Amino acid sequence: MAPADIGLIGLAVMGKNLVLNMIDHGFAVSVYNRSPEKTEEFLKEHGENISLQGFTAIEEFVQSLKRPRKIMIMIKAGAPVDEMISSLLPFLEEGDILIDGGNSYYLDSERRYIDLKKKGILFVGMGVSGGEEGARKGPSIMPGGNIEAWPVIAPIFQSIAAQVDGQPCCSWIGTGGAGHFVKAVHNGIEYGDIQLICETYEILKSRLDLSLEQIGNIFFEWNQTDLNSYLMGASAAVLTAKDENGVAVASTILDVAGQKGTGRWVAEDAIKAGVPMSLIIESVLARYLSAWKEVRRQAAREFPVASLLYQPSQEASVLIEDAREALYAAKIISYAQGFMLLKQISEERNWDLNLGELALIWRGGCIIQSAFLDKIHQGFESCPDAHSLMLQDYFKNVLLNSETGFRRAILHAVGAGVAIPCLASALAFYDGYRTENSPLFLVQGLRDYFGAHGYERQDRPRGEFYHTDWLGSKNASRM
């Protein structure tokens, strides 16, 4: 059989569907899995395809590939990736390409890029988003690492990626771990999107006593507006789905949300970088809190909702519109925070990320795909140096016009004792971001009082620090 165009290791859901996607686009693929039975099972299902070869010996797998060899690894992140790379190296030659398509931490990808470059192997850390359906029909693909690999692998991955307006949702991101970092931020934004939708659902449920189906239908309507997105449509579908007995499927799901860790990575990276990514952080914490099901059940008995809570008088239609405005405004703020982190890390690592291009890559094939991303692209095109999306004309006007409804929706939630960590965090960030003179002068004054850390003065140039003799003369001296 003729040599294959690409090899793929790891026949879990994503790997299998990527293989089938590649074959559909005319590429011959060799596959390998550490568990031979998975390879054999996959071949039984699809072995009639002349573009597919399966191997149970890694050396034979490597030798089946065209040179330079292109091998995509789709296995669990962490040590398993390093172990797989080590097992491949004895059979590789200079110029061969290794592609890690899993959810690896970007600093691991940086390390692998550097180590493999010394050995003459071209490493690519590739973010792949879209889940099972995206992998099969066209994902959003975020490749980064060794730029020398891109001309060789671009024809494959730009062919299998989602297409929007005739453009592939796949373009080169940057060196080192740039691809995996962008994918992680994508996942963090996804966490925020999902949590905001959940909180909006709870406001409508608690204040208007609407059913799952009624709220699902509202979400279907909102999906025809500026809130149009994969997640809004999926949320509507989940809320309205009924089983064969007519029971709402969502009513049977335990309110304990899992996570794979990428959201936590982004939260930690934001804190290390000094970027106030409050929504993504709150969305991660909300999932941790959800895991305390038994504790929450007990606390619900111990702390019943007070009967004299604030209840603003309002027509249902007005509250529904306020909730929609709050969701859209918070979504803008969440994405603004995500792009702030992308910009900050890009500058620190000299990646020169094209933020407008990233918005285009995410328009199709991925979990956060939405019409909203076109607005982000246009914003960066017209105002590339703006500190935040919030300062770009379109988003600025939306925030100004929706502020009243946003605040009313928050009041409804607080008045009903509804936990809205992300919506509340979004409003707090908005208010803090536009506060010229904040009370944090007191923080720095206290730091100087008990720790002699010094402070900058309003009437002096930035960068000059002073210390006050708080317990003595109260006079300040330059440090």
UniProtKB/Swiss-Prot annotation:
E.C. designation(s): 1.1.1.44
Swiss-Prot/TrEMBL catalytic activity: 6-phospho-D-gluconate + NADP(+) = D-ribulose 5-phosphate + CO2 + NADPH
Pathway membership: Carbohydrate degradation; pentose phosphate pathway; D-ribulose 5-phosphate from D-glucose 6-phosphate (oxidative stage): step 3/3
Residues that hold substrate according to the record: 103, 129-131, 186-187, 191, 260, 287, 447, 453
Residues at which NADP(+) binds: 10-15, 33-35, 75-77, 103
NADP recorded as keyword: yes
Keywords: Gluconate utilization, NADP, Oxidoreductase, Pentose shunt
GO biological process, one term: organic acid catabolic process
Active site: 183, 190
Main EC class the enzyme belongs to: oxidoreductase
One Pfam family linked to the record: NAD_binding_2
Recorded GO MF terms: NADP binding; phosphogluconate dehydrogenase (decarboxylating) activity
InterPro entries according to UniProt: 6-PGluconate_DH-like_C_sf, 6PGD_dom2, 6PGDH_C, 6PGDH_Gnd/GntZ, 6PGDH_NADP-bd, 6PGdom_BS, NAD(P)-bd_dom_sf, Pgluconate_DH
Family indicated by similarity: Belongs to the 6-phosphogluconate dehydrogenase family.
Subunit structure: Homodimer.
UniProt function note: Catalyzes the oxidative decarboxylation of 6-phosphogluconate to ribulose 5-phosphate and CO(2), with concomitant reduction of NADP to NADPH.
Protein name: 6-phosphogluconate dehydrogenase, decarboxylating
Organism placement in taxonomy: Bacteria, Pseudomonadati, Chlamydiota, Chlamydiia, Chlamydiales
